[in-house]
Each structure stands twice: as structure tokens, then as C-alpha cells.
Amino acid sequence: MNKRAALRGIGLLSVAVLSSGILVACSEDKPQFNAIDLTGADYAKDFALADPQGRTRTLADFRGKVVAMFFGYTHCPDFCPTTMAELAQVKQSLGAEGKRLQAIFVTVDPERDTAENLKSYVTAFDPEFVALRPENEQQLSALAKDFKVYYKKVEGKSPGSYTM
């Protein structure tokens, strides 16, 4: 086979692959909504945390929804906003089924994350996302232990600065 025939074959194959990808991307079908039931788990059974309006929220408040809890903090430079944006994209990609997904952002930095900051932060990703804030370090520690979440305050280079 000569070089010209090989290039023509590669070109045709590339066009076929690209065309297939475009057809799949243009499909009106939404991804199927699947969840894992953790009802029998011995962890993450419940919580009682304040939302930005001061109401105590529990897992029962979200009955009938699939709950995606994310532990983070509003001063997080990269991972937290990326994950929240991905949760918003997942919810949007589910179309009408997205109403069944409840994203909950739990701060691991109640020292800096005020109720106002939390509300602004989560609603920037989706107005239906909920932010919750432990009252103090003891409540945060107990919650993290129950949900098997690790967090640690790491002092920064300048006085008073830190990351989680």
C-alpha cells in the first residue's frame, strides 16, 4: 500500500470517528439517574446542622431526594469550587430528574465561613444547593467522624492565614 492510500484511509477513519462523536453529542437522551442506597450503613446516618437562615436541618428534610454531601470550605482555591461546579453540571445534565438531586455543602471551616458567605457561595453554583455549618469544632469533629471525613487546619506562611 502506498503512502497516499494510507493517508486517505486514516483521513476517512478520522472523519467517521468524528461524525460518530458529533451524533452522540447531539442526542436528546439524558443520562439515566441511578443512586446507591446506604440505608443499612453504620455511618453517615444523620446530622443536625444550621443552614444560613439559622434553621436546623437534618437528613429527613431531604427525604425523597438523592443527597450528595460535600465537605469543603469557601476559601478553598481549587478542589471545592471545581467539585461544586461538577455537581451543578450533573444536576443540569439530568434535566427534570435533576430536581431529585440535593447537593449539600458542609463547611469544615466554621471559623471563617459565616452564614452569609456560605449562602452566597453555594447559590452561585445552583440556587437549590444547601449550605450547612457546624456550630463549633466539637460538632464538626463528631460529624466528620460519623461521615468518615478527614480534615485538618494547616497554617499558612503569613500570620493568621491557613488552609483546610
Residue spans of the language-model regions?
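N-terminal export leaders
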Residues: 3-11
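Thiol/disulfide oxidoreductase modules built on the thioredoxin-like
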Residues: 138-164
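C-terminal motif of bacterial Sec signal peptides marking the signal peptidase cleavage site
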Residues: 24-25
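Bacterial N-terminal signal peptides
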Residues: 13-21
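Structural microenvironment flanking redox-active thiols in thiol-disulfide oxidoreductases
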Residues: 82-143
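A short beta-strand-turn-helix
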Residues: 47-67, 91
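Short active-site neighborhood of thiol/selenol oxidoreductases, capturing the structured segment around
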Residues: 60-83, 87
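Start-of-domain marker
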Residues: 38-41
